[in-house]
């Protein structure tokens, strides 16, 4: 694990001192009585206030900044994790970034063709220091997306790790965690870029064009609900 003497300080990507970040954090954590309650409030504000959009991938520090995500209102998993970490730090709650390689069984056809794999390398989450422990929080998928794709929304109570479920609400494979990386005080851009260049040829240089929300609507419409057992007579 990387040495992080102060997980509450701003960094180039986790710009927790930016006025927009400070204001967003103060607005959404205003009623929290302690760090745990404030962290939970911030989790839901980021999860549902910023729409998940993997087509918006930009692997530069300016593109990953928390303030940039607030300006755009949509982002993929890493900048959403960055935003949650920045909001926590703005509230004096220690937070850092964690990463895992996952096999994601639920994505759009356009994304699958573009990536040429169902493995998402360096999937981002936020690790928050609460009650003397580092707890994982994954604010990536907003509630509307979960409802459309029949995914159980990830809740966060500030006590237990919040990571993706292996199956969706229809019993289909959803997410498999293949490997957990280290946790970091800022985005390890060079390490992530090296992996992306190896496995996602051309994806970083030519961002994916398309409307993610529209693609999700089409995917959701094409999914047939799983058969329900017949009632006993």
Q: Which residue stretches match the model-derived regions?
A:
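His-Asp-centered catalytic microenvironments across diverse enzyme cores
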Residues: 2-3, 9, 13-16, 79, ...
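Secondary-structure boundary elements
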Residues: 2-72
